[in-house]
């Protein structure tokens, strides 16, 4: 297959005119979205349906992952008014499900965990019925930071392993074992909270390696999985090594479901936040849940 030319199934059109109102609102509230910063191919579809993944803690990342289009540089301090603006957007868009993510902020003592907590709390005050999903960085493996995020009681917490261990050089500053440990710790701190992870395919991995990662994710009791095609944002980013066939995504979805993932999104255009509301709202039906991630018996203050 010619990897320099996208196949027919990967030629989704982006139409900026279709989401002018969404652009206007985000500009008014001075909010970033990963949809724009990462040049997501689903932006027209999601913005037209008034769905967005909000990017808090600025638009500059402290790591240099070779696959990512988020700006690298020296970030600004967290904006204390940002949580209120995100909450205002949730209300004005009448969102039933909102996804919050951020660049990696290794420059902050808590990695930005406190800003996540403030954002979840503010949304909870003004839109208590909205399901809040977080897609977090690894916080350098800090259990204290993870405990703070869990205590804020989002319904779903995601952390992407992104690729197979052999290719982790593309994730500057990241560690495969640490990412698995993050997901394991989230489950230990809040057994009733759904966890989620995702992989990009087409980076040069083998199917056997993908299946091994899926097995690792199940060993840390990861609830949800997303599998999508990697598309290089520019010629300066890590190149696409393969355009994975749609039927391969279908087969991997079937295998993942047999492994025990509660819900799987798998397809060329799938991204970790794509069709986020379809994952079931985040409550694990096999665990008692009183509020978000925390059940009546749980607490993290002593961790």
Curated annotation (Swiss-Prot):
GO terms for molecular function: 4 iron, 4 sulfur cluster binding; lipoate synthase activity; metal ion binding. Its cofactor is [4Fe-4S] cluster. [4Fe-4S] cluster 2 binds at residues 61, 65, 68. Keywords: 4Fe-4S, Cytoplasm, Iron, Iron-sulfur, Metal-binding, S-adenosyl-L-methionine, Transferase. Pathway: Protein modification; protein lipoylation via endogenous pathway; protein N(6)-(lipoyl)lysine from octanoyl-[acyl-carrier-protein]: step 2/2. It is an enzyme of class 2 (transferase). Belongs to the radical SAM superfamily. Lipoyl synthase family. PROSITE patterns: RADICAL_SAM. Residues 47-262 form the Radical SAM core domain. The gene is lipA. Its EC number is 2.8.1.8. This is Lipoyl synthase. Pfam families: Radical_SAM. It is found in: Cytoplasm. HAMAP family: Lipoyl_synth. NCBIfam families: lipA (TIGR00510), PRK05481.1 (NF004019), PRK12928.1 (NF009544). SMART domains: Elp3. Its main location: cytoplasm.
């Amino acid at each position: 297959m010619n990897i320099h030319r996208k196949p027919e199934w990967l030629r989704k059109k982006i139409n900026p005119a279709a989401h002018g109102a969404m652009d206007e609102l985000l500009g008014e509230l001075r909010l970033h979205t990963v949809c724009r910063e990462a040049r997501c191919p689903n932006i027209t579809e999601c913005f037209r349906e008034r769905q967005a993944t909000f990017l808090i803690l600025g638009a500059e990342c402290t790591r240099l992952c070779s696959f990512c289009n988020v700006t690298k540089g020296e970030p600004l301090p967290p904006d204390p008014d940002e949580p209120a603006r995100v909450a205002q957007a949730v209300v004005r868009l009448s969102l039933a499900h909102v996804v919050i993510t951020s660049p990696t902020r290794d420059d902050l003592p808590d990695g930005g965990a406190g800003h996540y907590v403030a954002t979840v709390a503010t949304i909870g005050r003004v839109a208590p019925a909205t399901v809040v999903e977080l897609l977090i960085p690894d916080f350098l493996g800090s259990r204290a930071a993870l405990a703070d995020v869990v205590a804020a009681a989002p319904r779903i917490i995601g952390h992407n392993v992104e690729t197979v261990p052999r290719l982790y050089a593309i994730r500057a500053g990241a560690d495969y074992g640490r990412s698995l440990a993050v997901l394991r710790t989230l489950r230990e701190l809040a057994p009733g909270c759904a966890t989620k992870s995702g992989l990009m395919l087409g980076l040069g991995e083998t199917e056997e390696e993908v299946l091994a990662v899926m097995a690792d994710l199940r060993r840390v009791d990861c609830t949800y999985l997303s599998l999508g095609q990697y598309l290089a944002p520019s010629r300066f980013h890590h190149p696409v090594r393969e355009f994975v066939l749609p039927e391969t995504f279908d087969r991997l979805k079937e295998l993942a479901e047999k492994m025990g993932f509660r819900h799987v999104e798998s397809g060329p255009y799938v991204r970790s936040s794509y069709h986020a509301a379809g994952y079931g709202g985040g409550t694990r039906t096999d665990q008692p849940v009183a509020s978000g991630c925390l059940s009546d018996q749980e607490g993290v203050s002593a961790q």
